[in-house]
Amino acid sequence: MDTQDMTAFPHRHLLGIEGLTATDVELILDLADGYVEQNRSPGRKSAILSGLTVVNLFFENSTRTRTSFELAAKRLGGDCINMSSDGSSVKKGESLIDTAMTLNAMHLDVLVVRHQESGAPLLLSSKVNCAVINAGDGAHEHPTQALLDALTIRRHKGTLRGLTVAICGDILHSRVARSNIHLLNIMGARVRVVAPPTLLPGAVDRLGVEVHHSMATGLKDADIVMMLRLQLERMQGQYLPSQREYFRFYGLDYDKLAVARPDALIMHPGPMNRGVEIDSLVADDIHRSVILEQVELGVAVRMACLDLLTRGHRGTGA
């Protein structure tokens, strides 16, 4: 893929959606669009990252995100190393900063970080010489997920501006929700959050969203219905009476979906809890569900991010 005519990215790191402009977002999405087509062609690999090293440093479990970043690096011709906390000296008591500085001494080019503590990627970005990408930090942000969601929506709807997007479920613990709220507001969408009061953060309305406690009102005439899983690993059991009761009121099925627009897209960042936040028939609806397309486009978005953040190492025409 030829990137010589692409604009330089004005940020050294990608730590969150907050702080990006609409121009920044469009730049990433436009570049990712090209990578979607490259990934669908027989010759998927290029040499844009040839000679560069990407390290995935994950302190939380991941299937989609880590594999997606690994594929993205390899399809751009880069070297990729996967590290987890279980396989590192963190298990022996080494601090996060010492781990990062040790990796930095080995002259890596991009550090992709997932950590259970909000702000960990920001801290690391001040200690290393390479680009840092936030792959999810606590309940703070998950920028590449919001970007791939935006690309999925744009490819179906043509634009994000003016769309009504309902984000439903465990908003309180969701970094995906926060990144999507920031991005959708930047791009001119109308954002609703739909959840029981116990699964909403305090002062959520200050984020520029409409707050709904009922799926009937929250999904009314929505263009996009984005479901979130219950993050039980971050709960202590006091947030909801039972998963069955939760599905009755907040699980997406065809009855609840009926109030949304007839062409509304169904989205989910994964992993899904079928029968808890979404019914299997809805999740697998080939006409309305774009859940697997989100996974596909995630690779292209992460390729675009790696491309843009390494241009200072190799020049924009590499």
Swiss-Prot record:
It catalyses: carbamoyl phosphate + L-aspartate = N-carbamoyl-L-aspartate + phosphate + H(+). The keyword Membrane does not apply. InterPro entries: Asp/Orn_carbamoyltranf_P-bd (IPR006132), Asp/Orn_carbamoylTrfase (IPR006130), Asp/Orn_carbamoylTrfase_sf (IPR036901), Asp_carbamoyltransf (IPR002082), Asp_carbamoyltransf_Asp/Orn-bd (IPR006131). L-aspartate binds at residues 92, 175, 229. It is an enzyme of class 2 (transferase). Pfam families: OTCace, OTCace_N. Its EC number is 2.1.3.2. GO terms for molecular function: amino acid binding; aspartate carbamoyltransferase activity. Keywords: Pyrimidine biosynthesis, Transferase. GO terms for biological process: 'de novo' pyrimidine nucleobase biosynthetic process; 'de novo' UMP biosynthetic process; amino acid metabolic process. It comes from the Bacteria. Carbamoyl phosphate binds at residues 64-65, 114, 142, 145, 270-271. Pathway: Pyrimidine metabolism; UMP biosynthesis via de novo pathway; (S)-dihydroorotate from bicarbonate: step 2/3. Belongs to the aspartate/ornithine carbamoyltransferase superfamily. ATCase family. Heterododecamer (2C3:3R2) of six catalytic PyrB chains organized as two trimers (C3), and six regulatory PyrI chains organized as three dimers (R2). Catalyzes the condensation of carbamoyl phosphate and aspartate to form carbamoyl aspartate and inorganic phosphate, the committed step in the de novo pyrimidine nucleotide biosynthesis pathway. HAMAP family: Asp_carb_tr (MF_00001). This is Aspartate carbamoyltransferase catalytic subunit. It comes from Rhodospirillum centenum (strain ATCC 51521 / SW). The gene is pyrB.
